[in-house]
Design a protein with these regions (language model features):
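Short small/polar-residue motifs
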Residues: 17-22, 44-45, 89-93, 98
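Extracellular jelly-roll beta-sandwich "head" domains, especially the C-terminal globular C1q domain
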Residues: 51-208
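Self-maturation zones of extracellular/virion spikes and adhesins
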Residues: 1-43, 60, 66-72, 124, ...
């Protein structure tokens, strides 16, 4: 038995050459934790609560979104979809300045996106949304003829998701391309602070 039953943090510490790790009881939170360093409650990689619920506070997981409309996007040009804000970025792996996720470790990542498009020109040849990664690109494409739009212009919502292999340092983002037609499409942004108000967003998390 480790500990005397009183309110205290107890741990087993692994003293490495450059990095220490611990397995211990964070008494103030009533959690069994595994993490880096010697101080419980900080840099926790894995935590088990009294109900057996497991949390991973440092697991890469981001939900980024476009905060405002991008209007009259140029056709015949690849346009990186802006993701300048986020609801959460659990391990600080998403750059809201360049709209790019960078994998912190090698693994399999689930990447999904939803893009709202308005004022699509029915005379365009096709449009596409892509998940662009260092190891390959994955696209959803369509053309106005498949929609038989009753009016010109028209709008559409696109969802895409893929599990991809990423090495540490690999990147991922979403982009949009329209072939032909006029430069009039708008990429919807989020004009509210609620999840329900989002029109274009991206989520990424480490699966394994």
């Amino acid at each position: 038995t480790i500990g005397d039953g009183t309110a205290e943090d107890v741990q087993i510490r692994f003293d490495g050459n450059t990095v220490d790790y611990h397995l211990g009881l964070d008494d103030s939170a009533d959690k069994l934790t595994i993490g880096k360093g010697s101080a419980l409650g900080t840099t926790t990689s894995l935590a088990f609560d009294a109900d057996g619920i497991i949390s991973k506070p440092l697991l890469p997981f981001v939900h980024a979104y476009n905060s405002a409309n991008d209007d009259n996007v140029a056709h015949n040009t690849t346009h990186k979809i802006e993701m300048d804000a986020d609801f959460f970025d659990q391990n600080a792996d998403f750059n809201n300045t360049n709209d790019v996720f960078t994998a912190p470790v090698t693994g399999k990542y689930w990447i999904s996106g939803h893009v709202g498009l308005d004022a699509i020109d029915e005379d365009c040849n096709f449009w596409q949304v892509r998940v662009v990664t260092s190891n390959g690109n994955f696209r959803w494409a369509d053309d106005p003829k498949s929609y038989n739009p009753p009016t010109d212009p028209f709008d559409c919502r696109i969802s895409i998701g893929i599990c991809v292999d990423m090495d540490s340092g690999d990147t991922a983002h979403l982009d949009y391309f329209q072939s032909g037609g006029a430069s009039q499409v708008d990429i919807f942004g989020n004009n509210s602070t609620s999840l329900a108000g989002q029109q274009s967003y991206m989520t990424v998390y480490l699966v394994t």
